[in-house]
Amino acid sequence: MDTAGIRLTPKEIVSKLNEYIVGQNDAKRKVAIALRNRYRRSLLDEESKQEISPKNILMIGPTGVGKTEIARRMAKVVGAPFIKVEATKFTEVGYVGRDVESMVRDLVDVSVRLVKAQKKSLVQDEATAKANEKLVKLLVPSMKKKASQTNNPLESLFGGAIPNFGQNNEDEEEPPTEEIKTKRSEIKRQLEEGKLEKEKVRIKVEQDPGALGMLGTNQNQQMQEMMNQLMPKKKVEREVAVETARKILADSYADELIDQESANQEALELAEQMGIIFIDEIDKVATNNHNSGQDVSRQGVQRDILPILEGSVIQTKYGTVNTEHMLFIGAGAFHVSKPSDLIPELQGRFPIRVELDSLAVEDFVRILTEPKLSLIKQYEALLQTEEVTVNFTDEAITRLAEIAYQVNQDTDNIGARRLHTILEKMLEDLSFEAPSMPNAVVDITPQYVDDKLKSISTNKDLSAFIL
């Protein structure tokens, strides 16, 4: 697995995070240090490695300020497997619902996909060449071989040929004739020139097995995986365009070209050494004295999470995985509860605390303009596909930021997510009419913003429903 990302310095990691996330420098610094410590640990001898475990992080801040995005972008920067889970979705062991070990199994699934995607990219050219060869044969097929005439299984008792019931002659073909060879050469040339991309071709693909609906969520998933491994893969015929068929066939050939067992072992190691599990809404399982009935269940979930944070060996369909060196990031608003409401053992497993700042008007302005593909740039690009040019003035952007901030103050504070609703509502009419406005140029001014939003933003009841 490519580990170039893990060698980035904390400054380089923060710089990359700054391309997508505005502010929250303290949080960025702490996650960057946590990542760098992983690289430092990888350089130590085996004995020292076993003694050093990651320092888990607890992010505290309201929704929409960047907690999840910082963790997700960080994982992407270093190429680490990342999974986000919600603490409220888990139940105590013995109850119907997802048990806490499922987060580790989900992380391993992500790790396997990462490793296999990279290994497939290394054999992509060979797999595509095989796919093109198969496409030529599908577009110009040979004659099918005739089925064996030995249909009576008792015939072998009287000296006849022994039938091979396991052999499937359905796809076997006669050697191609000279005429077929000539046609295939022509088709191959046309494929290479891209002239047949929209032509239809029939291919066989593996049928997606149905789900079992008789068990609880977690038991259902494990039973389904076992059944899928035991049962033979069933294939169905589909008619698709050549360009789609090439992707399906190339992916299938790439699977055959890579060593699956080696990839699975590499994925398990990657999950163990580089895995990041983001546990959102951890404040919702914190206990307080207001509702003693629910506190028992919440404490049960916390106590189930604790062994995984301390280091447990979890069984997955790819093999066992140890959670001791995974990085866990807990996150929550902690409006009702406090970090000290978590059970003491769990508090001790999150030694690094970082409080994220609420967003001000200036932050909203920066979010709209600074990131690599900011919201403003996204909407400009979308409307440009309809040949409509949209220009946002600086004053209009400031006005949008002011409205977003005010609506957050007057209703629920959902942070930067408010900008999505504000922009979507403001550009609703333009997005609807854009196909009938080719080559139009639209200037978004403060007046335009107020015309579209002022009546809503000044009415608290309407704001709560619409924005």
UniProtKB/Swiss-Prot annotation:
Main location: cytoplasm
Disulfide pattern: none
Compartments, as annotated in UniProt: Cytoplasm
GO MF, any single term: ATP hydrolysis activity
SMART domains: AAA, ClpB_D2-small
Keywords (A to Z) from UniProt: ATP-binding, Chaperone, Cytoplasm, Nucleotide-binding
Subunit details: A double ring-shaped homohexamer of HslV is capped on each side by a ring-shaped HslU homohexamer. The assembly of the HslU/HslV complex is dependent on binding of ATP.
Family of the protein in this entry: Belongs to the ClpX chaperone family. HslU subfamily.
UniProt-recorded name of the protein: ATP-dependent protease ATPase subunit HslU
Lineage: Bacteria, Bacillati, Bacillota, Bacilli, Bacillales
